[in-house]
Amino acid sequence: MYYGEIKNCDIANGEGVRVTLFVSGCTNRCKNCFQPQTWAFDYGQPFTAETEEALLQMLAPAYINGLTLLGGEPFEPENQRGLLPFLRLVRERLPGKTIWAFTGFTWEHLHTDGSHPRCEVTDELLSLVDVLVDGRFVEELHDISLRFRGSSNQRIIDVPRTLSSGGITLWEDQ
């Protein structure tokens, strides 16, 4: 897996102050994507054990609320496989931090057997995520007044509550 950028102290992509990882590789190719350079799976730098340790150190301070995954597309199968061991580490070493993920795929698509991007690690990866912003960016539905999303078709899903209830539960700003 490759990544295009890491932002420390990001306040735009999730609740509170966050560390944001922009993974590389995306087959969605949304019109007017704000990161089209990350569509290439080999854009940026390889995601290594050293990268993981650097991210864990950035996440450690008490003022950092958590980690946000963007792209590219974190839920491309190869990215899911690359992210899963790292998210396990985050949960093990920093259990109080929240994990947000943005995806151009819908919750329903991620749960449809046989569909791209569902793979053998999708369920476990989702179980490690607190909040999922799902759905493609749609230029015609772009609305700058929306918090944490670019277009009105996108949802901010409370993953633990959704998994426990069996129905989509939207995240509510605390």
Can you annotate each of these PLM segments?
Residues F86-R91, H142-Q174:
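P-loop/Walker A phosphate-binding loop and immediately adjacent motor/lid segment at beta-alpha junctions
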Residues E76, E140-L141:
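Short glycine-rich, flexible loops that bind phosphorylated cofactors or substrates
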Residues M1-G4, V17, N32-S115, E120, ...:
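Conserved Radical SAM active-site core
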Residues E124-S127, G150:
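Short, conserved loop/helix-junction motifs that constitute active-site signature segments
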Residues K7, T103, R136, P160:
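Residues at the C-termini of beta-strands that transition into short coil/loop
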Residues Y2-R29:
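N-terminal pre-triad scaffold of radical SAM enzymes
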Residues D130:
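Receiver (REC) domain switch/active-site residues of two-component response regulators
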